[in-house]
């Protein structure tokens, strides 16, 4: 495929529409989503970008027209709404995407009129661009089926106290999946990131995409981090959750000092940098402070009113000192939070499933065990 001097994409062999979802996901093929923004916001795919045929209001008007007057009238209204300058602007977006992503595909909800319309208008402009057969709905169903396959694998669950390094540990395991990465949340009261968390549909899509790209054989054992039913605001697929509750556990054991340093770097140093990169130094520090305060507030009932008040005061002092260039003061409230709240809670939870523990050790020992 090439682009000629007139800017039109030409090809000796025109690319066909595709239902080869596995190859599309595995190879990270760019996708152009022509659904309305409201649809895209409810759920999309990892490498998709939204260049809609109709905006939200136009889609709603066409939908009402379809219900009241039928398909022919709805198509006529759609053509009237997307015409002139609005059509030209959108066509330019589609053309640019096609030129920049000659290996890509486009899709609407079911692979019907909307994607076919965009495909036809592109063709009239000299660009032959294929679509996803069955659209979003078909690809979404494929990913849901893959999640069911994931739950059939033999699993090993990686457990350990807060700060033991479970998530970075997974990066060293070729046969692992990062549930928290797919969820966009680290699972604890302080687990949110600067960017908003994935919604449920996007979490499922991202997890399935990650699984497909791992190209695992069905008999291959997978390593997953120990998680509750919820990771932030999203929940694990039921079949996967059920499989995880029966799987053997490998427990990382590291000292309080080691874990405290991990927490300090991850939740203080890195999060400060991320907030300030997103919002600027002053606004970023304010947002970071609110993030920490909110995290502590969420565990106030478990701490008790008096202890929460004490740690809140220490945290406030630490933020003041950090703003003066001394972030190490955060250790004064992080240490008791770990030793008095997170450690007892996690040890209680681990005690309920101690019969499933097959190995305990530090990071290096656990990694060696899983590689054997």
Curated annotation (Swiss-Prot):
* Reaction(s) catalysed by this chain's protein: 5-methylaminomethyl-2-thiouridine(34) in tRNA + selenophosphate + (2E)-geranyl diphosphate + H2O + H(+) = 5-methylaminomethyl-2-selenouridine(34) in tRNA + (2E)-thiogeraniol + phosphate + diphosphate; 5-methylaminomethyl-2-thiouridine(34) in tRNA + (2E)-geranyl diphosphate = 5-methylaminomethyl-S-(2E)-geranyl-thiouridine(34) in tRNA + diphosphate; 5-methylaminomethyl-S-(2E)-geranyl-thiouridine(34) in tRNA + selenophosphate + H(+) = 5-methylaminomethyl-2-(Se-phospho)selenouridine(34) in tRNA + (2E)-thiogeraniol; 5-methylaminomethyl-2-(Se-phospho)selenouridine(34) in tRNA + H2O = 5-methylaminomethyl-2-selenouridine(34) in tRNA + phosphate
Q: Say which domain of life the source belongs to.
A: Bacteria
Q: Where is the active site?
A: 108 (s-selanylcysteine intermediate)
Domain named Rhodanese: which ranges? 25-148
Q: Does the keyword section mention Transferase?
A: yes
* Keyword line: Selenium, Transferase
Role description? Involved in the post-transcriptional modification of the uridine at the wobble position (U34) of tRNA(Lys), tRNA(Glu) and tRNA(Gln). Catalyzes the conversion of 2-thiouridine (S2U-RNA) to 2-selenouridine (Se2U-RNA). Acts in a two-step process involving geranylation of 2-thiouridine (S2U) to S-geranyl-2-thiouridine (geS2U) and subsequent selenation of the latter derivative to 2-selenouridine (Se2U) in the tRNA chain.
The molecule here is called tRNA 2-selenouridine synthase
Native source organism of the sequence: Colwellia psychrerythraea (strain 34H / ATCC BAA-681) (Vibrio psychroerythus)
Q: Which gene encodes it?
A: selU
């Amino acid at each position: 495929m090439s682009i000629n001097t007139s800017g039109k994409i030409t090809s000796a062999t025109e690319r066909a529409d595709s239902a080869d979802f596995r190859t599309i996901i595995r190879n990270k093929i760019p996708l152009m989503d022509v659904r309305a923004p409201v649809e895209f916001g409810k759920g999309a795919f990892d490498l998709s970008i939204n260049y809609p045929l109709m905006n939200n209001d136009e889609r709603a008007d066409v939908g009402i027209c379809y219900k009241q007057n039928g398909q022919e009238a709805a198509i006529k209204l759609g053509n009237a709404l997307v015409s002139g300058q609005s059509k030209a602007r959108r066509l330019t977006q589609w053309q640019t995407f096609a030129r920049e992503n000659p290996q890509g595909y486009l899709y609407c909800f079911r692979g019907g009129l909307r994607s076919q319309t965009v495909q036809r208008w592109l063709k009239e402009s000299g660009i032959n661009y294929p679509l996803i057969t069955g659209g979003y709905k078909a690809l979404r169903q494929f990913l849901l089926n893959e999640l069911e396959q994931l739950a059939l694998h033999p699993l090993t669950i990686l457990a350990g106290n807060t700060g033991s390094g479970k998530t970075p540990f997974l990066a060293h395991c070729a046969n692992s999946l990062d549930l928290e990465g797919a969820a966009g949340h680290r699972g604890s009261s302080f687990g949110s990131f600067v960017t908003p968390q994935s919604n449920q549909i996007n979490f499922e899509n991202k997890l399935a995409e990650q699984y497909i790209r791992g190209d695992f054989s069905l008999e291959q054992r997978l390593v997953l981090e120990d998680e509750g039913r919820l990771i932030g605001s999203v929940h694990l697929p039921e079949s996967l959750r059920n499989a995880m509750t029966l799987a053997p556990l490998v427990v990382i054991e590291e000292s309080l000092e080691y874990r405290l340093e991990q927490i300090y770097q991850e939740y203080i140093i890195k999060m400060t940098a991320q907030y300030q990169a997103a919002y600027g130094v002053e606004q970023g520090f304010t947002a970071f402070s609110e993030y920490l305060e909110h995290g502590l507030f969420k565990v106030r009932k478990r701490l008790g009113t008096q202890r929460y008040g004490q740690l809140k005061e220490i945290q406030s002092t630490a933020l003041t000192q950090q703003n003066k260039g001394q972030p190490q003061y955060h250790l004064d409230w992080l240490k008791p939070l770990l030793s008095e709240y997170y450690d007892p809670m996690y040890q209680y939870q681990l005690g309920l499933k101690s019969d499933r523990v097959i190995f305990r050790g530090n990071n290096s020992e656990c990694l060696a065990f899983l590689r054997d």
